[in-house]
Amino acid sequence: MRRCRWSAGESGNRKRLTVTGKIKKKEREEAMETETTGENSRIMEKQRAFFESGKTFDLAFRRAALVRLERAVAAHEKEICEALYQDLGKSETEGYMCEVGLTLGEIREMRKKLRRWSRTKRVGAGLANFPAKGYIVQEPYGVALIMSPWNYPFMLTIEPLAGAIAAGNCCVIKPSAYSPATSAVIARLIREIFPEGYVTVIEGGRKENAELLEQKFDYIFFTGSVSVGKLVMQKAAAHLTPVSLELGGKSPCIVDRTAKISLAARRIVFGKFLNCGQTCVAPDYVLVEECVKDEFLKELIRWTKKMYGSALENPDYGRIVNRKHFERIKGLIDSRHLVWGGEVKEETLQIAPAILYPVSETDACMQEEIFGPILPVLPVKNMEEARAFVKSRPHPLACYVFTASKKTERMFLKETAFGGGCVNDTIMHLTPSGLPFGGVGSSGMGAYHGKKSFETFSHAKSVLKKSTLLDVTARYQPYTGWKRRLIRAIGNR
């Protein structure tokens, strides 16, 4: 490539302008991009070859892989918890309770029930096909991409991976760049137990995400923001790749006059301020009946004090993931409505639990998912007003109702759309492996956990096996009178 140099004459005032350095920089960037693209293509080729070898179709192979994964997670527990502390300030107790322990339970569930879930299911073939047998065969998609977030960086990476392995897929894992310590531990752990062609980890940021999404995967499982989820779906559409999108939204919490107010406040405080509010299913705001609002606020503050004390000095209270999110969350604390907490510690990126009241739907904290330790409380006259408020907004990932009234319970469970939730608790619906977890509408699509994870990463292949001993001629032309009568008689059976 020809190098160019422009310069002014001796009497000119223009400074010398060289483009040589710019050209070299561009050449280096293009070379690196080509190298990365080539590396991704090489990994995809290895994964395709591994899948085509048929090894992952063997249930014994899958079960052995789950055993290795379970043992590796247990063996690296301390290292994982240390990484979670580096990335998010999570205490060892919270790291185990919310990430390592739940992950081990999920892997164990899959290991024990894999054979049962994988069985070919017999279904009726209908009178029109007599004699015949119908089957549903679960088969893996092929090569799956798992893109995980930073807020629960270990659990939200390894739990989907376990489902993909159980279903017989090969996997490329892309952890979040915002949790580098945990991403590094995951990469080392995976390299220790699996060959690159079977499961591999690609670390990096947006550039690596974009390059991976150009590849043709057989399934994409994404957990993250709505905006990035839309981009993932757009890229997947180019290859008609099926996707699961685990997104977010403003999850409401409703407290009516019949609720046990103190217990409701305690459980809301737990679900909201766990992981500094950086939980996709955390209660985003509370709608409380006016007749119990004073008692509720009193109990809310009491339990926040009791559970967290001086939060910024509490070793079990973490921090905000990075400066960008810290500044965003800090900007949502409106001093006009602050009734408790909200202290900040700039050097450690910590924000103490903040309770805002009274809040209206036009306030800044109600315009976006908070994803931080701020709890807005909005008074409502009755449950009909609360229901109308929830229904007027995009479908949330979760919804929580505190009530002793069957009428209120039925109202919210049957008349409002949300991904999942609890009656008289918060966030705990994530813990049973028998309950699928996922969103609806703008909060996501698809679900996982337990058997649902296996089904998510499996294609249900329908097979009809027909007998050759008998061939009913009524379906063949020409359609005479008796054939038409017979078709009408058995056509809907």
Which sequence ranges carry the predicted segments?
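Rossmann-like NAD(P) dinucleotide-binding subdomain of oxidoreductase/dehydrogenase enzymes
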Residues: 127-263
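Conserved C-terminal "lid"/linker of ANL adenylate-forming enzymes
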Residues: 3-27
